[in-house]
Amino acid sequence: MVSPGQKKLKLFRNDVPVREVVHTWVPGDWTHIAVQIRPMPGLKWIVMAKVWHSSELEPKEWQLAWTENVEPLPGRATAWGQPFSGTPIAVDDLRVWRID
């Protein structure tokens, strides 16, 4: 989640923040977010995330990483937002795909 007021990108697990990094939101600019979940040896999963503005190139490195010991539940991918000071949120070009 991008938190404009706190100037952070946060990764949550069941409504609990597990990782965060500094990120400055730019009003009126599109924010791109990429999240990837991959299996690791030993029945673990790594969750990685990165964020960038439409005026920037996508970062090569992941900005957040967190290891999870519980396999993700199957189901539908979702995106949600929480308006900042009543500012509307628009989600466009949401893409989800399986990485083998």
Name each region found by the language model.
Residues 1-100:
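Extracellular glycan-recognition regions
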